[in-house]
Amino acid sequence: LIRAHRGQLATARNIRRLLEGSQLAARPKKHVQDPYSFRCIPQVHGASKDTIDYVESVLTTEINSTTDNPTVFPDEDMVVSAGNFHGQPIALAMDFLAIALAELGNISERRTYKLISGARELPKFLVANPGLNSGFMIPQYTAASIVSQSKGLCMPASVDSIPSSQGQEDHVSMGSNAATKLYRVVLNTERVLAIELFNAAQALDFRRPARSSAAIEHMVAEYRKRVPFIDNDSVMYPHIESSIQFLRTL
């Protein structure tokens, strides 16, 4: 192995599995290199997966720990005033996970932009009559706005502190703020990924009659039961909402 990060390896294996048997993947290649947002999916997604695993380990330790104060040891007949209530381990993990998930949204939006840019023989804005129709331009605007918001939400809460209780509590973790920011990033990233799916399914239909893999074709067939191919301009947000609901079934 030339780069043995577990998340990268798992992502690469998953991509190969999902694309097995794809006619599109087997086509002769005309381009020397793909954009980073496609070529580096294992490296970027994998790093986020490694972060998720790390955060899971922190949370597993925390929920199996005693975080009371004071700590009571009945067998030793001891009551000890200590600091296990401090939320720093969780606060740092929440901030770290927010960054990792925001990056999944960030790279997803870049792929969405490439899909609507008229590259690789796809029509501009993924519609048959661009210019007359703005097609998928506005969903990409939406994704760009959301990822920009998530970047702001990635300012670490755990680097902040404010004293209370007459200075006795003079360093606090701000873990609850980190967690609420993380929750907003989770929802933002989910929406950005749904927009990418919306665009990718449209792009795949423009590749017909070539077929992708059996796994991808099955997923797209199920997706098309909820979200149609877009011929002309229409209100897009119901399709984005339907895409979110579909993602939650996977």
Functional labels for PLM-detected ranges:
Residues 1-250:
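C-terminal auxiliary extensions adjacent to catalytic cores
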